[in-house]
Amino acid sequence: MVQNKLKKSVGWAALKYVQSSRIIGVGTGSTVTYFIEALNSIKEKIEGVVSSSNYSSNQLKKIGIPLCNLNSLHELDVYVDSADEIDSHMQMIKGKGGALTKEKIIAAAAKKFICIVDSSKQVNILGRGPLPIEVIPMARSLVARELVRLGGLPEYRHNVITDNGNNILDVYNMKIVNASLLETKINNIPGVVSVGIFAKRRADIVLIGTREGIKIIE
């Protein structure tokens, strides 16, 4: 499949940006799976990885790369992750895999955030697809009502519990013109753990896998 080839190419291209880092952050998703595959080729140079999900942690363990606790680190040089959508300002929507809270924490801790995507993830305005929001279970209905007031159409993601023990609401009909403002508004709703808008901490470098090769935006 062409899309998988693009994901693999951009996953391997990200190796260039972690060669000098002994400890790195790693996200979650199908594109990141290819990056983890690529890490296997330089694992002897890596002291440890801060992982954003149990799924990625298991992948890293299988290839023998040790995991690190973010609390034990003074600094984190680089974080590599993918996105569900990304605009020309390097603002993103993330969270399809349910790991948005840990992804946001690691991104905030890292000096540099490398986003790896295939060209299908590029959008003019964020909100083409659903916006994931992690919520405390007891607040799910309250948060949903507040999201309706903001113009959204929230749907409960059934049979999904995050690594933090919470629920996910997927919000449709959100054309996100001012991503930073909406990120703040949703984060301020009681019961919201994290919203999948990455505007305040956007990517520093974006690698886009295209049919013509790797496109780099800085």
Swiss-Prot record:
The keyword Isomerase applies. The active site is at E103. InterPro entries: NagB/RpiA_transferase-like (IPR037171), Ribose5P_isomerase_typA_subgr (IPR020672), Ribose5P_isomerase_type_A (IPR004788). Substrate binds at T28, G29, S30, T31, D81, S82, A83, D84, K94, G95, K96, G97, K121. Its EC number is 5.3.1.6. Keywords: Isomerase. SUPFAM superfamilies: D-ribose-5-phosphate isomerase (RpiA), lid domain, NagB/RpiA/CoA transferase-like. It is an enzyme of class 5 (isomerase). Homodimer. Belongs to the ribose 5-phosphate isomerase family. This is Ribose-5-phosphate isomerase A. It comes from Blochmanniella pennsylvanica (strain BPEN). The gene is rpiA.
